[in-house]
Amino acid sequence: MKLISWNVNGLRACNGKGFQDFFRDVDADFFCIQETKMQGGQLDLEFEGYESYWDYAEKKGYSGTAIYAKHHPISVSYGLGVDEHDHEGRAVTLEMEDFYLVCVYVPNSQDGLRRLDYRMRWEDDFRAYVTRLATKKGVIICGDMNVAHNEIDLKNPATNHMSAGFSDEERAKMTELLGAGFVDSWRFQHPDEVKYSWWSYRMKARERNVGWRIDYFLVSENLKDRIESTDIHNDIFGSDHCPVELCIR
């Protein structure tokens, strides 16, 4: 079974930059999207053989998550069930027969870490949410988690120590999440490989491969042995992020 996750940085914009070609070529069982940046009815983008589930932000042109699924879920839920967090369209969860799939767009801590306090509350509530799910069946988490966990996960760790996405606090929360029973599937399969999933639009960062790995597939420990392959499609353009892939048995 193949799963894809992609922060498209605006689906309407990405749709004009090859999104549909990649969607059809990759032929995923589940295709998860972050930063749709749209409201219901703004873009009619359905694909034969797929159902789609959308969590829109109340603020127009902001955030938003979605899942295209070939397989009909048992149930669908939106958000974390915490009112403070559930107005920004940041999570869609599908309950399947033997796992939950959570598509998430984690809040950015912003320049000067001005939203870090909120990010810390989000992290604790999100970890509580997915660990509750994991008491019932396996969990697959995918999306833009807005953190490079270790120094290998970004080009310039020394100069980004206090930057959003590489602060000690954010990295520690990722460590806590993994410690709660989850596995970073890419790093599990590629312990020493350097590959990035996001590049700033500034300073020709993508051309020079000055990037960060902030897009993940995490799986609960009881699914670890089902990991077949992982990939980071850094040859696919259309966004400042590239798609990431997980195949499970």
Question: Across the structure, where does each feature detected by a protein language model lie?
Answer:
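Structured beta-strand-rich core segments of catalytic domains in phosphoester-bond hydrolases
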Residues: 37, 42-109
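N-terminal, active-site-proximal structural segment of metallo-dependent hydrolase catalytic domains
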Residues: 1-47, 51, 57-63, 78, ...
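Active-site beta-strand/loop signature of hydrolases that rely on acidic residues for catalysis
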Residues: 7, 23-41, 101, 130-151, ...
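Conserved beta strand-loop-helix elements of the APE1-like EEP
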Residues: 60-75, 193, 205-225
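Metal-dependent phosphoesterases centered on the DNase I-like endonuclease/exonuclease/phosphatase
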Residues: 51, 125-210, 214
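Active-site-proximal beta-strand elements of phosphoester/diester hydrolases
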Residues: 1-9, 98-110, 142
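Surface-exposed cleft-lining segments at the edges of enzyme active sites
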Residues: 81-82, 107-123, 158-162
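Active-site beta-strand termini and strand-to-loop segments that position acidic
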Residues: 70, 94-97, 220-221, 239, ...
